[in-house]
């Protein structure tokens, strides 16, 4: 597949599933900032917490730093995985230019990560209970003739003709009280995917043929959304969502 000139201008030779639902103007702005000024959007405590929760889950299934040829490796017990997960989390340095907001979130999230990791483990086990073997995250390429570059994707977990995508929701800050302190609300797991999440899952499905399920995880519990309990994840609706993704990238 030849790369069109406007893509070459921004040194962008592929799309990714994670960005497939972003408005085109936003995507072009990101390309321009990265190519012309070397600027990428910075990490923050919230996505970093989700990355670390998945890392902990991966460790307990022997899927950390997954290699498709090697397959699952020796899993760690929950205590070992939790320690390594928190060590990874603690390596992050909060932003210093947002009046302490990121640092406050970083501190508040930490105590809830072990519970989120445990719920993530339970969600993966439930979602892929019929799988003889679980695959972890590795790079997959998909070509769509109506899109002018290849599409890159990374599935969180797959097996038994299903793929599972971990979606973490972190605690939410409450208003500051009169005494100057603040509490945090732990949300219940979501039960319905957003339109953008369905669009993302439609690309995974079209590429692999594996039916998607979304693992909504919080410190309060988890919910597995799949084609059995979520009409939006049934094949007819996935096809409609996929066509919408294709149209949005043209």
Identify what each model region corresponds to.
Residues 136, 193, 203-250:
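Metal-dependent nuclease catalytic regions and adjoining charged, substrate-binding loops involved
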Residues 29-32, 198, 242-245:
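Short hydrophobic alpha-helical segments that form membrane-spanning helices or hydrophobic packing faces
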